[in-house]
C-alpha cells in the first residue's frame, strides 16, 4: 500500500517535470531549436495540422531553423502559419523555409527569465501539492491502523526525500535555462 502511494506520487511528480521541460523548450533563448515550432498549426487542405506532420524541422546553424515541407505546395501555408504563430519569427521562403532567430534584447532576456522562474515555481508548488496528497494518504492509513506509526514515519521520510529530489531537479533545470537565456 505504501509502495503504491509512493509510486503513484512519483509518477505524478515525473509528469510535472515533463510539463516543465515542455514549457522550457518553448521559451526562446536566442538559439535555434526545433521545439520552438512545436505548437505551430498549418492549414493542410482546410484542416489544422501540426507543423511536424507536414514538414521536417531541423537546425541549420545556431541561429537558423530549416523547415522542409514534404509537399512543395505547402511552402506558403507553412510560412503563413509560422508568421501567425506569434513567436516573433520572420521566415524567409524559397523551396525551403529558413527561420532566422532574432537576437534577444536584454529586456526580452529578462522577461524570458522571469517567465522561466514563474513556470519553475508553479512546478515546485505542484510537486509540494503531490507530496501533501501522498502524506494525507499515509496518515489516513495510519489512522485506520493499517500501518504502524514507524511505517508512517518511514514512509513520510521517503516521500520527503522523493520531493526534495524533484525540487532539486527543477532548480537545476531552471538554472540551466537561465544560463542559456543570459548567454549573449
Curated annotation (Swiss-Prot):
Localization of this protein: Cytoplasm
Disulphide connectivity of cysteines: none
An annotated GO BP: cytoplasmic translational termination
Job description of the protein: Responsible for the release of ribosomes from messenger RNA at the termination of protein biosynthesis. May increase the efficiency of translation by recycling ribosomes from one round of translation to another.
Family: Belongs to the RRF family.
Key word Cytoplasm present: yes
InterPro entries according to UniProt: Ribosome_recyc_fac (IPR002661), Ribosome_recyc_fac_dom (IPR023584), RRF_sf (IPR036191)
Name assigned to this protein: Ribosome-recycling factor
Main location: cytoplasm
Signal peptide segment: none
Gene Ontology MF terms: ribosomal large subunit binding
Superkingdom field: Bacteria
Gene3D superfamilies, alphabetized: 3.30.1360.40, Ribosome-recycling factor
GO cellular component: cytosol
UniProt keyword list: Cytoplasm, Protein biosynthesis
